[in-house]
Protein backbone atom coordinates (compact mmCIF):
# COMPACT_ATOMS: atom_id res chain seq x y z
CA UNK A 1 0.00 0.00 0.00
CA UNK A 2 1.58 3.25 -1.15
CA UNK A 3 0.39 6.82 -1.41
CA UNK A 4 0.66 7.86 -5.09
CA UNK A 5 3.12 10.62 -4.17
CA UNK A 6 5.60 8.18 -2.58
CA UNK A 7 8.35 7.03 -4.95
CA UNK A 8 9.38 3.52 -3.86
CA UNK A 9 11.64 3.13 -6.90
CA UNK A 10 13.72 6.28 -6.31
CA UNK A 11 17.27 5.46 -7.38
CA UNK A 12 20.40 7.43 -6.63
CA UNK A 13 22.55 5.39 -9.00
CA UNK A 14 24.00 3.04 -6.41
CA UNK A 15 25.79 5.79 -4.49
CA UNK A 16 25.88 5.83 -0.71
CA UNK A 17 25.13 9.46 0.06
CA UNK A 18 25.52 11.08 3.49
CA UNK A 19 22.26 11.14 5.43
CA UNK A 20 22.26 14.95 5.46
CA UNK A 21 22.54 15.03 1.66
CA UNK A 22 19.72 12.52 1.20
CA UNK A 23 17.46 14.37 3.66
CA UNK A 24 17.92 17.66 1.79
CA UNK A 25 17.98 16.23 -1.76
CA UNK A 26 15.81 18.17 -4.27
CA UNK A 27 13.88 15.02 -5.18
CA UNK A 28 12.97 14.36 -1.54
CA UNK A 29 9.93 16.08 -0.06
CA UNK A 30 9.19 13.85 2.96
CA UNK A 31 11.77 12.62 5.48
CA UNK A 32 11.27 10.07 8.27
CA UNK A 33 13.79 10.25 11.11
CA UNK A 34 13.64 7.09 13.22
CA UNK A 35 17.03 6.83 14.91
CA UNK A 36 18.17 6.34 18.51
CA UNK A 37 20.21 9.09 20.14
CA UNK A 38 21.68 12.21 18.57
CA UNK A 39 22.67 10.53 15.28
CA UNK A 40 19.48 11.81 13.65
CA UNK A 41 20.12 15.45 14.55
CA UNK A 42 22.20 16.33 11.48
CA UNK A 43 19.80 14.85 8.90
CA UNK A 44 16.81 16.42 10.68
CA UNK A 45 18.39 19.87 10.60
CA UNK A 46 19.39 19.43 6.95
CA UNK A 47 15.85 18.43 6.01
CA UNK A 48 14.24 21.34 7.87
CA UNK A 49 16.68 23.85 6.39
CA UNK A 50 15.72 22.52 2.96
CA UNK A 51 12.03 23.10 3.73
CA UNK A 52 11.08 19.41 3.91
CA UNK A 53 8.30 17.77 5.87
CA UNK A 54 9.92 15.69 8.62
CA UNK A 55 8.08 12.86 10.37
CA UNK A 56 9.98 12.50 13.62
CA UNK A 57 10.19 9.30 15.64
CA UNK A 58 13.56 10.08 17.23
CA UNK A 59 12.62 11.77 20.48
CA UNK A 60 16.23 12.42 21.51
CA UNK A 61 16.67 14.72 18.51
CA UNK A 62 13.84 17.03 19.58
CA UNK A 63 14.73 16.79 23.27
CA UNK A 64 18.38 17.69 22.63
CA UNK A 65 17.85 20.57 20.20
CA UNK A 66 14.15 21.39 20.26
CA UNK A 67 14.54 25.17 20.24
CA UNK A 68 16.92 25.07 17.27
CA UNK A 69 14.79 22.61 15.29
CA UNK A 70 11.55 24.52 15.81
CA UNK A 71 13.27 27.77 14.87
CA UNK A 72 14.71 26.27 11.67
CA UNK A 73 11.33 24.79 10.75
CA UNK A 74 9.68 28.20 11.13
CA UNK A 75 12.39 30.02 9.18
CA UNK A 76 12.33 27.60 6.24
CA UNK A 77 8.57 26.87 6.23
CA UNK A 78 9.20 23.20 7.02
CA UNK A 79 6.95 20.88 9.02
CA UNK A 80 7.64 18.52 11.91
CA UNK A 81 5.05 15.74 12.16
CA UNK A 82 4.99 13.43 15.21
CA UNK A 83 5.25 9.66 14.86
CA UNK A 84 5.22 8.78 18.58
CA UNK A 85 1.77 7.40 19.41
CA UNK A 86 1.23 9.88 22.26
CA UNK A 87 2.11 12.95 20.21
CA UNK A 88 0.22 11.69 17.19
CA UNK A 89 -2.81 11.37 19.48
CA UNK A 90 -2.48 14.96 20.70
CA UNK A 91 -1.94 16.17 17.15
CA UNK A 92 -5.13 14.44 16.03
CA UNK A 93 -7.11 15.81 18.99
CA UNK A 94 -6.00 19.38 18.23
CA UNK A 95 -7.06 19.36 14.61
CA UNK A 96 -10.05 21.57 13.92
CA UNK A 97 -9.70 23.39 17.24
CA UNK A 98 -9.35 27.18 17.16
CA UNK A 99 -9.01 27.75 20.90
CA UNK A 100 -5.81 26.93 22.76
CA UNK A 101 -6.31 23.87 24.98
CA UNK A 102 -6.10 24.04 28.74
CA UNK A 103 -3.96 20.94 29.28
CA UNK A 104 -2.28 18.06 27.45
CA UNK A 105 -2.44 14.62 29.07
CA UNK A 106 0.12 12.02 28.03
CA UNK A 107 -0.66 8.43 28.95
CA UNK A 108 1.93 5.84 29.96
CA UNK A 109 1.55 2.09 30.35
CA UNK A 110 3.78 2.25 33.42
CA UNK A 111 6.07 -0.44 32.05
CA UNK A 112 6.57 -3.90 33.55
CA UNK A 113 7.64 -2.73 37.03
CA UNK A 114 5.21 0.01 37.95
CA UNK A 115 4.04 -1.72 41.14
CA UNK A 116 7.47 -2.97 42.20
CA UNK A 117 8.95 -1.92 45.53
CA UNK A 118 12.31 -0.14 45.67
CA UNK A 119 13.97 -3.41 46.64
CA UNK A 120 12.39 -5.20 43.69
CA UNK A 121 13.41 -2.41 41.31
CA UNK A 122 17.01 -2.65 42.49
CA UNK A 123 17.03 -6.34 41.55
CA UNK A 124 15.61 -5.93 38.02
CA UNK A 125 17.78 -7.57 35.35
CA UNK A 126 18.27 -6.44 31.74
CA UNK A 127 16.42 -9.53 30.58
CA UNK A 128 13.38 -8.58 32.67
CA UNK A 129 13.50 -4.94 31.56
CA UNK A 130 13.43 -5.91 27.88
CA UNK A 131 9.97 -7.50 28.20
CA UNK A 132 7.46 -4.65 27.88
CA UNK A 133 3.85 -5.62 28.67
CA UNK A 134 2.36 -3.80 25.66
CA UNK A 135 4.82 -2.52 23.06
CA UNK A 136 7.55 -4.28 21.08
CA UNK A 137 10.41 -1.80 20.74
CA UNK A 138 14.18 -1.53 20.52
CA UNK A 139 16.32 -2.17 23.59
CA UNK A 140 17.04 1.47 24.50
CA UNK A 141 13.44 2.67 24.35
CA UNK A 142 12.21 -0.48 26.14
CA UNK A 143 14.51 0.20 29.10
CA UNK A 144 13.54 3.89 29.02
CA UNK A 145 9.90 2.82 29.21
CA UNK A 146 10.67 0.67 32.25
CA UNK A 147 12.36 3.59 34.07
CA UNK A 148 9.70 6.03 32.77
CA UNK A 149 12.52 8.15 31.31
CA UNK A 150 10.75 7.67 27.98
CA UNK A 151 7.67 9.47 29.28
CA UNK A 152 9.78 12.33 30.57
CA UNK A 153 11.38 12.73 27.15
CA UNK A 154 7.90 12.75 25.64
CA UNK A 155 6.89 15.63 27.92
CA UNK A 156 9.81 17.65 26.50
CA UNK A 157 8.80 16.60 22.99
CA UNK A 158 5.24 17.77 23.56
CA UNK A 159 6.51 21.11 24.81
CA UNK A 160 8.33 21.75 21.53
CA UNK A 161 5.88 20.14 19.13
CA UNK A 162 2.84 21.99 20.44
CA UNK A 163 4.43 25.12 21.97
CA UNK A 164 2.90 24.21 25.31
CA UNK A 165 4.16 25.11 28.82
CA UNK A 166 5.52 22.29 30.94
CA UNK A 167 3.17 23.01 33.84
CA UNK A 168 0.20 22.33 31.54
CA UNK A 169 1.42 18.92 30.38
CA UNK A 170 0.23 16.07 32.62
CA UNK A 171 0.91 12.33 32.76
CA UNK A 172 -1.45 9.48 33.62
CA UNK A 173 -0.61 5.81 34.03
CA UNK A 174 -2.94 3.84 31.75
CA UNK A 175 -1.90 0.16 31.70
CA UNK A 176 -4.01 -0.90 28.71
CA UNK A 177 -2.46 1.70 26.36
CA UNK A 178 -5.77 2.08 24.53
CA UNK A 179 -6.04 5.84 25.10
CA UNK A 180 -2.83 7.22 23.65
CA UNK A 181 -3.23 10.78 24.94
CA UNK A 182 -5.89 13.36 25.75
CA UNK A 183 -6.43 17.08 25.38
CA UNK A 184 -8.44 19.05 27.94
CA UNK A 185 -10.08 22.29 26.80
CA UNK A 186 -11.00 25.47 28.63
CA UNK A 187 -14.61 24.37 29.11
CA UNK A 188 -13.55 21.17 30.87
CA UNK A 189 -14.28 18.85 27.95
CA UNK A 190 -11.70 16.31 26.82
CA UNK A 191 -10.74 14.77 23.52
CA UNK A 192 -8.92 11.45 23.41
CA UNK A 193 -7.49 9.31 20.63
CA UNK A 194 -8.12 5.60 21.12
CA UNK A 195 -6.81 2.66 19.13
CA UNK A 196 -5.20 -0.72 19.58
CA UNK A 197 -1.54 -0.21 20.61
CA UNK A 198 0.12 -0.64 17.22
CA UNK A 199 2.81 1.76 16.01
CA UNK A 200 1.81 1.22 12.39
CA UNK A 201 -1.17 3.53 12.90
CA UNK A 202 0.69 6.72 13.94
CA UNK A 203 3.35 6.01 11.31
CA UNK A 204 0.70 5.61 8.64
CA UNK A 205 -1.12 8.76 9.75
CA UNK A 206 2.07 10.83 9.47
CA UNK A 207 2.49 9.49 5.93
CA UNK A 208 -1.12 10.01 4.89
CA UNK A 209 -1.82 13.37 6.56
CA UNK A 210 -4.13 15.20 6.00
CA UNK A 211 -5.91 12.12 4.67
CA UNK A 212 -6.55 8.77 6.35
CA UNK A 213 -5.77 5.57 4.50
CA UNK A 214 -7.74 2.36 4.85
CA UNK A 215 -5.55 -0.46 6.10
CA UNK A 216 -7.23 -3.82 6.82
CA UNK A 217 -3.98 -5.03 8.38
CA UNK A 218 -4.42 -2.76 11.39
CA UNK A 219 -6.30 -4.30 14.36
CA UNK A 220 -9.57 -2.71 15.47
CA UNK A 221 -10.78 -2.25 19.02
CA UNK A 222 -13.34 -4.85 20.05
CA UNK A 223 -15.49 -3.17 22.69
CA UNK A 224 -17.04 -6.51 23.62
CA UNK A 225 -13.65 -7.58 24.96
CA UNK A 226 -12.52 -4.37 26.65
CA UNK A 227 -13.86 -4.54 30.19
CA UNK A 228 -12.25 -1.42 31.63
CA UNK A 229 -9.90 1.49 31.02
CA UNK A 230 -7.79 2.07 34.13
CA UNK A 231 -5.81 5.12 35.25
CA UNK A 232 -3.35 5.76 38.07
CA UNK A 233 -1.35 8.79 39.21
CA UNK A 234 2.38 8.89 38.53
CA UNK A 235 4.77 7.88 41.32
CA UNK A 236 7.76 10.17 40.84
CA UNK A 237 9.55 8.85 43.93
CA UNK A 238 9.90 5.28 42.70
CA UNK A 239 10.65 6.39 39.14
CA UNK A 240 13.04 9.35 39.52
CA UNK A 241 14.06 9.31 35.84
CA UNK A 242 10.68 10.82 34.98
CA UNK A 243 11.15 13.67 37.43
CA UNK A 244 14.72 14.27 36.23
CA UNK A 245 13.55 14.53 32.63
CA UNK A 246 10.72 16.96 33.37
CA UNK A 247 12.99 19.14 35.52
CA UNK A 248 15.68 19.15 32.81
CA UNK A 249 13.07 20.20 30.27
CA UNK A 250 11.85 23.04 32.48
CA UNK A 251 15.42 24.24 33.13
CA UNK A 252 16.17 24.08 29.41
CA UNK A 253 19.43 25.15 27.82
CA UNK A 254 21.96 22.34 27.68
CA UNK A 255 20.28 20.28 30.42
CA UNK A 256 18.07 18.19 28.09
CA UNK A 257 21.08 17.31 25.91
CA UNK A 258 23.01 16.22 29.01
CA UNK A 259 19.99 14.22 30.21
CA UNK A 260 19.74 12.32 26.91
CA UNK A 261 23.45 11.58 26.67
CA UNK A 262 23.80 10.44 30.29
CA UNK A 263 20.73 8.23 29.97
CA UNK A 264 22.04 6.65 26.78
CA UNK A 265 25.32 5.76 28.50
CA UNK A 266 23.57 4.50 31.65
CA UNK A 267 21.17 2.28 29.69
CA UNK A 268 24.06 0.77 27.73
CA UNK A 269 25.88 0.05 31.00
CA UNK A 270 22.76 -1.56 32.46
CA UNK A 271 22.21 -3.74 29.40
CA UNK A 272 25.80 -4.93 29.64
CA UNK A 273 25.27 -5.88 33.34
CA UNK A 274 27.76 -3.25 34.55
CA UNK A 275 25.27 -1.28 36.67
CA UNK A 276 21.92 -2.01 38.29
CA UNK A 277 18.50 -0.85 37.16
CA UNK A 278 18.19 1.87 39.81
CA UNK A 279 21.73 3.05 39.05
CA UNK A 280 20.43 4.49 35.77
CA UNK A 281 18.68 7.33 37.62
CA UNK A 282 21.66 7.80 39.97
CA UNK A 283 24.07 8.28 37.08
CA UNK A 284 21.75 10.60 35.17
CA UNK A 285 21.12 12.69 38.28
CA UNK A 286 24.83 12.86 39.12
CA UNK A 287 25.68 14.00 35.62
CA UNK A 288 23.01 16.71 35.66
CA UNK A 289 24.19 17.93 39.07
CA UNK A 290 27.75 18.36 37.83
CA UNK A 291 26.80 20.13 34.63
CA UNK A 292 27.18 23.89 34.19
CA UNK A 293 24.19 24.92 32.11
CA UNK A 294 24.26 27.20 29.08
CA UNK A 295 20.85 28.85 28.79
CA UNK A 296 20.78 29.59 25.01
CA UNK A 297 23.25 27.12 23.51
CA UNK A 298 24.40 26.95 19.91
CA UNK A 299 24.39 23.60 18.12
CA UNK A 300 28.12 23.28 18.78
CA UNK A 301 27.59 23.88 22.50
CA UNK A 302 24.83 21.26 22.59
CA UNK A 303 27.14 18.71 20.98
CA UNK A 304 29.92 19.63 23.42
CA UNK A 305 27.51 19.17 26.34
CA UNK A 306 26.51 15.78 24.92
CA UNK A 307 30.14 14.66 24.72
CA UNK A 308 30.90 15.92 28.22
CA UNK A 309 27.84 14.16 29.65
CA UNK A 310 28.89 10.83 28.14
CA UNK A 311 32.30 11.09 29.77
CA UNK A 312 30.84 12.19 33.10
CA UNK A 313 28.25 9.38 33.15
CA UNK A 314 30.93 6.80 32.37
CA UNK A 315 33.17 8.26 35.08
CA UNK A 316 30.34 8.13 37.64
CA UNK A 317 29.62 4.50 36.74
CA UNK A 318 33.20 3.66 37.69
CA UNK A 319 32.64 5.00 41.19
CA UNK A 320 33.78 8.59 40.72
CA UNK A 321 32.65 10.77 43.61
CA UNK A 322 34.61 13.96 42.97
CA UNK A 323 33.51 16.67 40.57
CA UNK A 324 34.12 15.59 36.99
CA UNK A 325 36.06 18.40 35.31
CA UNK A 326 36.78 18.58 31.62
CA UNK A 327 37.50 21.41 29.25
CA UNK A 328 34.31 20.94 27.23
CA UNK A 329 31.94 21.04 30.20
CA UNK A 330 30.22 24.17 28.88
CA UNK A 331 31.87 27.04 30.77
CA UNK A 332 30.13 29.31 33.18
CA UNK A 333 26.41 29.66 33.63
CA UNK A 334 24.85 32.23 31.36
PLM features: residue spans?
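Catalytic, metal-anchored helix/loop core of enzyme active sites in primary metabolism
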Residues: 1-334
Amino acid sequence: MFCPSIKPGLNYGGQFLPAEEIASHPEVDFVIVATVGKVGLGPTLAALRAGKTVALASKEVLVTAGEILVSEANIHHAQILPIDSEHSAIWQCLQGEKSKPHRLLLTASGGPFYHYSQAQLAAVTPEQALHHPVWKMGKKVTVDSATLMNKGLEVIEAHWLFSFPFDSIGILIHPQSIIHSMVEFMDGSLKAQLSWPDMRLPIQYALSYPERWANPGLPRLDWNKINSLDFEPVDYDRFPCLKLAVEAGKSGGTYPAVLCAADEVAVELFLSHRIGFTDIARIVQGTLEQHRRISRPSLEELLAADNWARECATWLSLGGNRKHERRDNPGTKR
